[in-house]
Amino acid sequence: MYKIQLLSCIALTLALVANGAPTSSSTGNTMKEVKSLLLDLQLLLEKVKNPENLKLSRMHTFDFYVPKVNATELKHLKCLLEELKLLEEVLNLAPSKNLNPREIKDSMDNIKRIVLELQGSETRFTCEYDDATVNAVEFLNKWITFCQSIYSTMT
Protein backbone atom coordinates (compact mmCIF):
# COMPACT_ATOMS: atom_id res chain seq x y z
CA MET A 1 0.00 0.00 0.00
CA TYR A 2 2.76 2.43 0.89
CA LYS A 3 4.83 1.34 -2.10
CA ILE A 4 2.65 3.30 -4.50
CA GLN A 5 2.89 6.46 -2.40
CA LEU A 6 6.64 6.06 -2.04
CA LEU A 7 7.09 5.48 -5.77
CA SER A 8 4.88 8.49 -6.53
CA CYS A 9 6.95 10.64 -4.19
CA ILE A 10 10.21 9.47 -5.78
CA ALA A 11 8.85 10.07 -9.28
CA LEU A 12 7.71 13.58 -8.36
CA THR A 13 11.07 14.38 -6.78
CA LEU A 14 12.93 13.18 -9.87
CA ALA A 15 10.64 15.21 -12.12
CA LEU A 16 11.27 18.37 -10.09
CA VAL A 17 15.02 17.85 -10.04
CA ALA A 18 15.10 17.07 -13.76
CA ASN A 19 13.19 20.27 -14.55
CA GLY A 20 15.61 22.45 -12.65
CA ALA A 21 13.45 23.17 -9.63
CA PRO A 22 15.58 24.77 -6.95
CA THR A 23 16.37 22.62 -3.96
CA SER A 24 17.06 23.91 -0.47
CA SER A 25 20.77 23.17 -0.76
CA SER A 26 21.04 25.19 -3.96
CA THR A 27 19.38 28.32 -2.54
CA GLY A 28 22.63 29.60 -1.04
CA ASN A 29 24.47 29.08 -4.32
CA THR A 30 21.64 30.73 -6.24
CA MET A 31 21.82 33.78 -3.98
CA LYS A 32 25.58 34.04 -4.55
CA GLU A 33 25.14 33.75 -8.32
CA VAL A 34 22.34 36.35 -8.41
CA LYS A 35 24.47 38.72 -6.32
CA SER A 36 27.43 38.13 -8.64
CA LEU A 37 25.27 38.78 -11.70
CA LEU A 38 23.93 41.95 -10.09
CA LEU A 39 27.45 43.25 -9.43
CA ASP A 40 28.61 42.44 -12.97
CA LEU A 41 25.63 44.25 -14.49
CA GLN A 42 26.19 47.27 -12.23
CA LEU A 43 29.86 47.41 -13.20
CA LEU A 44 28.94 47.24 -16.87
CA LEU A 45 26.36 50.00 -16.39
CA GLU A 46 28.96 52.25 -14.74
CA LYS A 47 31.27 51.81 -17.70
CA VAL A 48 28.50 52.45 -20.22
CA LYS A 49 27.37 55.60 -18.39
CA ASN A 50 30.90 56.94 -17.87
CA PRO A 51 31.01 60.48 -19.30
CA GLU A 52 34.59 59.90 -20.48
CA ASN A 53 33.24 57.42 -23.02
CA LEU A 54 32.24 59.96 -25.64
CA LYS A 55 32.55 57.27 -28.29
CA LEU A 56 29.76 55.39 -26.56
CA SER A 57 27.22 58.15 -27.17
CA ARG A 58 26.26 56.53 -30.46
CA MET A 59 25.78 53.28 -28.56
CA HIS A 60 22.77 54.84 -26.87
CA THR A 61 21.00 54.95 -30.23
CA PHE A 62 20.87 51.15 -30.48
CA ASP A 63 17.62 49.52 -29.43
CA PHE A 64 17.35 46.60 -27.06
CA TYR A 65 14.31 44.53 -26.25
CA VAL A 66 13.03 43.63 -22.82
CA PRO A 67 10.46 40.98 -21.91
CA LYS A 68 6.81 41.82 -22.51
CA VAL A 69 5.88 40.68 -19.02
CA ASN A 70 7.67 41.72 -15.87
CA ALA A 71 10.63 39.41 -15.44
CA THR A 72 10.18 37.76 -12.06
CA GLU A 73 11.66 34.29 -12.38
CA LEU A 74 15.10 32.91 -13.16
CA LYS A 75 13.77 31.47 -16.43
CA HIS A 76 13.41 35.06 -17.70
CA LEU A 77 17.21 35.28 -17.75
CA LYS A 78 17.02 33.60 -21.14
CA CYS A 79 15.79 36.95 -22.47
CA LEU A 80 18.84 38.70 -21.02
CA LEU A 81 21.10 36.12 -22.60
CA GLU A 82 19.54 36.64 -26.04
CA GLU A 83 19.93 40.43 -25.96
CA LEU A 84 23.38 40.27 -24.36
CA LYS A 85 24.86 39.20 -27.70
CA LEU A 86 23.72 42.47 -29.28
CA LEU A 87 25.00 44.50 -26.33
CA GLU A 88 28.42 42.92 -26.66
CA GLU A 89 28.52 43.73 -30.38
CA VAL A 90 27.49 47.33 -29.73
CA LEU A 91 30.11 47.78 -27.00
CA ASN A 92 32.78 46.40 -29.31
CA LEU A 93 31.90 49.07 -31.88
CA ALA A 94 33.10 51.83 -29.58
CA PRO A 95 36.10 50.69 -27.55
CA SER A 96 37.56 53.29 -25.21
CA LYS A 97 40.15 53.50 -22.46
CA ASN A 98 37.50 52.54 -19.89
CA LEU A 99 36.02 49.73 -21.92
CA ASN A 100 38.44 47.77 -24.06
CA PRO A 101 37.41 44.72 -26.11
CA ARG A 102 39.11 42.25 -23.76
CA GLU A 103 37.25 43.63 -20.72
CA ILE A 104 34.00 43.52 -22.65
CA LYS A 105 34.53 39.89 -23.62
CA ASP A 106 35.51 38.89 -20.07
CA SER A 107 32.53 40.68 -18.58
CA MET A 108 30.08 39.21 -21.08
CA ASP A 109 31.50 35.70 -20.69
CA ASN A 110 31.14 35.95 -16.92
CA ILE A 111 27.55 37.20 -17.18
CA LYS A 112 26.70 34.41 -19.66
CA ARG A 113 28.25 31.77 -17.38
CA ILE A 114 26.26 32.99 -14.38
CA VAL A 115 23.01 33.18 -16.36
CA LEU A 116 23.46 29.64 -17.68
CA GLU A 117 24.12 28.36 -14.15
CA LEU A 118 21.05 30.15 -12.80
CA GLN A 119 18.83 28.87 -15.60
CA GLY A 120 19.70 25.27 -14.88
CA SER A 121 18.11 22.79 -17.21
CA GLU A 122 15.18 25.05 -18.11
CA THR A 123 15.31 25.33 -21.91
CA ARG A 124 11.66 25.31 -22.94
CA PHE A 125 10.97 28.93 -22.01
CA THR A 126 10.46 31.26 -24.97
CA CYS A 127 10.97 34.98 -24.52
CA GLU A 128 8.19 37.31 -25.56
CA TYR A 129 9.53 40.80 -26.06
CA ASP A 130 7.77 44.11 -25.65
CA ASP A 131 7.23 46.06 -28.87
CA ALA A 132 8.82 49.13 -27.31
CA THR A 133 12.60 49.19 -27.22
CA VAL A 134 15.02 50.70 -24.72
CA ASN A 135 18.58 52.01 -24.91
CA ALA A 136 21.58 50.26 -23.35
CA VAL A 137 21.36 52.11 -20.02
CA GLU A 138 17.65 51.36 -19.63
CA PHE A 139 18.29 47.75 -20.65
CA LEU A 140 20.97 47.27 -17.99
CA ASN A 141 18.87 49.10 -15.38
CA LYS A 142 15.94 46.78 -16.08
CA TRP A 143 18.06 43.67 -15.52
CA ILE A 144 19.71 45.18 -12.43
CA THR A 145 16.24 45.76 -10.99
CA PHE A 146 15.34 42.17 -11.85
CA CYS A 147 18.40 40.83 -9.99
CA GLN A 148 17.69 43.04 -6.99
CA SER A 149 14.11 41.78 -6.89
CA ILE A 150 15.14 38.12 -7.11
CA TYR A 151 17.84 38.62 -4.48
CA SER A 152 15.48 40.36 -2.06
CA THR A 153 12.91 37.58 -2.31
CA MET A 154 15.58 35.02 -1.45
CA THR A 155 16.78 36.78 1.71
From Swiss-Prot:
Keywords: Adaptive immunity, Cytokine, Disulfide bond, Glycoprotein, Growth factor, Immunity, Secreted, Signal. One of its GO terms (cellular component) is extracellular space. GO terms for biological process: adaptive immune response; interleukin-2-mediated signaling pathway; positive regulation of biosynthetic process. SUPFAM superfamilies: 4-helical cytokines. It comes from the Eukaryota. InterPro entries: 4_helix_cytokine-like_core, IL-2, IL-2_CS. Its main location: secreted. Disulfide bonds join C79-C127. It is found in: Secreted. GO terms for molecular function: cytokine activity; growth factor activity; interleukin-2 receptor binding. Gene3D superfamilies: 1.20.1250.10. Pfam families: IL2. The keyword Signal applies. Glycans are attached at T23. The keyword Acyltransferase does not apply. Residues 1-20 form the signal peptide. Belongs to the IL-2 family. Cytokine produced by activated CD4-positive helper T-cells and to a lesser extend activated CD8-positive T-cells and natural killer (NK) cells that plays pivotal roles in the immune response and tolerance. Binds to a receptor complex composed of either the high-affinity trimeric IL-2R (IL2RA/CD25, IL2RB/CD122 and IL2RG/CD132) or the low-affinity dimeric IL-2R (IL2RB and IL2RG). Interaction with the receptor leads to oligomerization and conformation changes in the IL-2R subunits resulting in downstream signaling starting with phosphorylation of JAK1 and JAK3. This is Interleukin-2. It comes from Bos taurus (Bovine). The lineage of its organism: Eukaryota, Metazoa, Chordata, Craniata, Vertebrata.
